[in-house]
Design a protein with these regions (language model features):
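Long insertion/accessory domains within large nucleic-acid-processing enzymes
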Residues: 261, 266-269, 400, 445, ...
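Conserved nucleotide-binding/hydrolysis modules and their immediate coupling elements
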Residues: 208-313, 321-325, 486, 495-545, ...
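Canonical P-loop GTPase G-domain recognition
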Residues: 124, 134-194
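Interdomain boundary/hinge elements
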Residues: 39-42, 127, 153-165, 199-210, ...
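Residue-level signature of catalytic and energy-coupling elements of molecular machines
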Residues: 17, 23, 55, 74-76, ...
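P-loop NTPase switch module centered on the Walker A-proximal segment
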Residues: 1-101, 105, 145, 214-217
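Conserved structured catalytic cores and adjacent interaction surfaces
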Residues: 5-19, 81, 104-116, 122-124, ...
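A short, contiguous, amphipathic alpha-helix enriched in charged residues
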Residues: 320-343, 555, 559
Length: 609
């Protein structure tokens, strides 16, 4: 077991897709994790299917590398602000951070969010400029941007004068200067060992361990992960579980199994001392933020307050005419059990029951909740969700809403369209700066102003724009924001879509379905080109008479249907619509399926206005 002065605990902070997980891969390879003949796995830290597909890290992962006689525990943090709950907890386990910045893009909003948390905790920072071998790298400008960011976030003198390493994660090289060419990652390892402090804590004192994350295993149940702040922990040791914010919580527990992180896996150990990051099992009701103490000295540790959720959706049992046909888990009990299981691992999530068949699920952003929905679909769940709603707060007697700092990198010819659209969505332009051949626009915009904007943004920038946002503050409500400039095409009757019916319907807008697709009355089958809903009969067949030959149907030319992803469906949803999620399909539908009732409700609403 490594002694305390030979341990370094670090977290890697980076924006989505700046190469964090790839760099960790190279550190593992050069740290000798893989045997000579062992097949290496690309992006080992992104172990979930969704993470590999989307190229993002959702849950923070722990791993360790051996360099000389040092053990470096590396914690990979999510770069997306929607998973900020993960980030804040993880920073409590480490003594320093590596700020990884793309040599072309520079620091981005999510980087700012996590770095601010790290600086507040007083962590030392190593700046790593990654992808220096890219043809569009702007190394010197990016270094200036990092210094400006550190100044902006009130970094201390020591944090401001952080060492900088220049690396290429893909090639596995690092150097001390921007013009030098490294051969391996030795400069990075040396900087970590010499600059980051070893963990402190009295190995001989009474035990204190703060649980920073929870893993779940079908065989051993909950696995608590955290750093030992003080003392030593042993297998079969009796402990007291307490909570800093809730003095009433005091339960007894026993350490059944104890592991340290070794390379990519967990290594079982009999004992571990202060400074080490460990995983332990045996306590069924352990949760994030609790402290494990020696029963003779119960002293809970303070816990990083996790930011509140900003958006909410209603998850409900699917009650459409196609309910139960494609899913394996379809009842409210299945839905409740699955959401409760997610709460075990995700502290940023809040779930409240809304009647018998519905649950309000609040999270840190659309992406946070869409990842959960996609995971549930893949596991065989069937459910419906409402349009996202922002969670407001009352501050000094005024109703306030979340405001996001949005940064967009766009081609020069798209600037006008983006600024105009953001103005309509109550966004305030903070500044524009040229970045290479493009412009970086920075806005403060209400969270609800960004609902449904990503698709429009990609259209306006012809797919070349990059946008990201992070929660900035709360401000008084900014008034009505128009969500959608188009209406829905709604199926008039249940049946199977036919070429003849679709051909007539496509004149009214763009369709989501092709011939042979089963539909039901009230299902949204396309986008109406006007700003109003329109009912169409896509099941209509051509009447066969002597005058109308069946063969002439072959001449009908149908445009290809639009296929929406889960995020695009959520962005398209109107307030009176639901998204039906099943393992095989995503269907948008009206809350009220009956056409006559919908029209009656619309008349009532107009009369009240």
């Amino acid at each position: 077991m490594a002694s305390q002065d030979k341990i370094r605990n670090i977290a890697i902070i980076a924006h989505v897709d700046h190469g964090k997980t790839t760099l960790v891969d190279e550190m593992l390879k050069q740290g000798g994790i893989y045997r000579e003949n062992q097949a290496t796995v690309e992006r080992v830290m992104d172990s979930g299917d969704l993470e590999r597909e989307r190229g993002i890290t959702i849950l923070a992962k722990n791993t360790s590398v051996h360099y000389k006689d040092y053990k470096i525990n590396i914690v990979d943090t999510p770069g997306h602000a929607d998973f900020g709950g993960e980030v804040e907890r993880i920073l409590k386990m480490v003594n320093g951070v590596i700020l990884l910045v793309d040599a072309a893009e520079g620091p981005m909003p999510q980087t700012r969010f996590v770095l601010q948390k790290a600086l507040e905790l007083g962590h030392k920072v190593i700046v790593a400029v990654n992808k220096v071998d890219k043809p569009d790298a702007r190394i010197h400008e990016v270094m200036d941007e990092v210094l400006e960011l550190l100044l902006d976030l009130d970094a201390t003198d020591e944090q401001f004068n952080s060492p900088t390493i220049f690396c290429s994660g893909r090639q596995g090289t690092a150097s001390y200067g921007p013009d030098e060419m490294g051969t391996d990652l030795t400069p990075l390892f040396e900087t970590i060992v010499n600059y980051i402090d070893p963990p402190t804590g009295d190995e001989n004192g009474p035990l204190q361990l703060l649980v920073s994350s929870i893993d779940y295993n079908e065989y051993v149940g909950r696995i608590a992960v955290g750093r030992i702040e003080r003392g030593t922990i042993k297998v079969n040791q009796e402990v007291t579980i307490c909570d800093f914010h809730d003095p009433e919580v005091k339960t007894k527990g026993k350490v059944v199994a104890l592991y340290t992180f070794d390379g990519l896996g967990k290594a079982p150990v009999q004992t571990a001392s202060a400074g080490e990051i460990v995983a332990l099992s045996g306590m069924a009701d352990i949760t994030i933020g609790r402290t494990l103490c020696d029963p003779a000295a119960v002293e809970p540790l303070p816990f990083v307050k996790i930011s509140d959720p900003t958006i909410e959706m209603t998850f409900a049992v699917n009650d459409s005419p196609f309910a139960g046909k494609e899913g394996k888990y379809v009842t409210s009990r299945n839905l409740r059990d699955r959401l409760e299981k997610e709460l075990l691992k995700d502290v940023s999530l809040h779930v409240t029951e809304q009647g018998t068949d519905a649950f309000n699920v609040a999270g840190r952003g659309e992406m946070h909740l869409s990842i959960l929905m996609e995971a549930m679909r893949r596991e065989g769940y069937e459910f419906s969700v409402s349009t996202p709603r922002v969670l407001t707060r009352e501050i000094d007697g005024k109703l306030c809403e979340p405001i996001e700092r949005m940064v967009a990198d766009v081609p020069e010819e798209s600037m006008g369209a983006v600024i105009e659209k953001m103005g309509k969505r109550k966004g305030d332009l903070l500044g524009m700066t040229p970045v290479g051949s493009r412009y970086r626009l920075e806005f403060l915009v209400p969270s609800r102003g960004l609902f449904g904007y990503r698709n429009e943004f990609l259209t306006d920038t012809r797919g070349e724009g990059i946008m990201s946002s992070v929660l900035d503050s709360y401000a008084p409500m900014k008034g009505e924001i128009e969500r959608r400039q188009v209406g829905s095409l709604i199926a008039f009757e249940s049946g199977e879509a036919c070429s003849y019916g679709l051909f007539n319907a496509q004149e009214r807008g763009s369709l989501f379905i092709g011939p042979g697709t089963p539909v039901y009355a009230g299902m949204v089958v396309g986008i109406c080109s006007r700003n109003e809903d329109m009912t169409v009969n896509v099941c209509k067949k051509k009447q066969l008479t002597n005058m109308r030959a069946a063969g002439s149907d072959e001449a009908l030319r149908l445009t290809s249907p639009l296929i929406f992803s889960l995020e695009q469906c959520l962005e398209f949803l109107a307030d009176d619509e639901l998204l039906e999620c099943t393992p095989k399909s995503l269907r948008i539908r009206k809350r009220e399926l009956d056409h006559a009732l919908r029209m009656r409700n619309l008349m009532k609403k107009r009369a009240q206005e």
